UniProtKB/Swiss-Prot annotation:
It is a multi-pass membrane protein. GO terms for molecular function: electron transporter, transferring electrons within cytochrome b6/f complex of photosystem II activity; metal ion binding; oxidoreductase activity. Component of the cytochrome b6-f complex, which mediates electron transfer between photosystem II (PSII) and photosystem I (PSI), cyclic electron flow around PSI, and state transitions. The gene is petB. It comes from Parasynechococcus marenigrum (strain WH8102). This is Cytochrome b6.
Length: 218
């Protein structure tokens, strides 16, 4: 590369970054691809916004039944731009779900789930389930009336399953009733377990797309 900087030369000598850049920039894009093929990428952007704003809120949120609501109120009223961070988190969550639904419809209607891309479809559906679970667990964290009763209803749904229903309810709630153990479980799922799960499946999803390319037109 002509007129390259010393920093570029240093990385190029060790990592051959030009080959990586060439591979990314010269990847073939089929002529039938249009704006609707960007929905998956927009979903990724929403996830990154969720990660950044969620991480920022963990500095102020207190996952206890006694302090959860007041910590959210403190974030909204006393923390500089706290209201903006939480609002962006909520709106990007809604946008992520919307973009995900549209992306699933686009893939289905264009036949992107067919052979040899079945595993790409499976990882995508798995990510859709995780994304919805994000919404369920995050809804409870303010521990207000809406969040409390939402958790009580959602965690009680598995009770209808024969044999293992009651066990699943206690597993979700951390006991027979909704309380501190429930909030702790939902907080752990929302801020640690699900982000890592989603990141792993997202990496698998992107690697398969990279390997197989974009599906052709119907």
């Amino acid at each position: 590369m002509a007129n390259s900087s010393p920093v570029y030369d240093w990385f190029q000598e060790r990592l051959e970054i030009q080959d990586i850049a060439d591979d990314i920039s010269t990847k073939y894009v089929p002529p039938h691809v249009n704006i609707f093929y960007c929905l998956g990428g927009i979903t990724l952007v929403c996830f990154l916004i969720q990660f950044a704003t969620g991480f920022a809120m963990t500095f102020y949120y207190k996952p206890t039944v006694a302090e959860a609501y007041s910590s959210v109120q403190y974030l909204m009223t006393d923390v500089s731009f706290g209201w903006l961070i939480r609002s962006v988190h909520r709106w990007s969550a809604s946008m992520m779900v919307l973009m995900l639904i549209l992306h699933v419809f686009r893939v289905y209607l264009t036949g992107g789930f067919k052979r040899p891309r079945e595993l790409t479809w499976v990882t995508g559906v798995t990510m859709a389930v995780i994304t919805v679970s994000f919404g369920v667990t995050g809804y409870s964290l303010p521990w207000d009336q809406v969040g409390y009763w939402a958790v009580k209803i959602v965690s009680g749904v598995p009770a209808a399953i024969p044999v293992v229903g009651d066990f699943m309810v206690e597993l979700l709630r951390g006991g027979e009733s909704v309380g501190q153990s429930t909030l702790t479980r939902f907080y752990s799922l929302h801020t640690f377990v699900m982000p890592w799960l989603l990141a792993v499946f997202m990496l698998m999803h992107f690697l398969m797309i990279r390997k197989q390319g974009i599906s052709g037109p119907l």
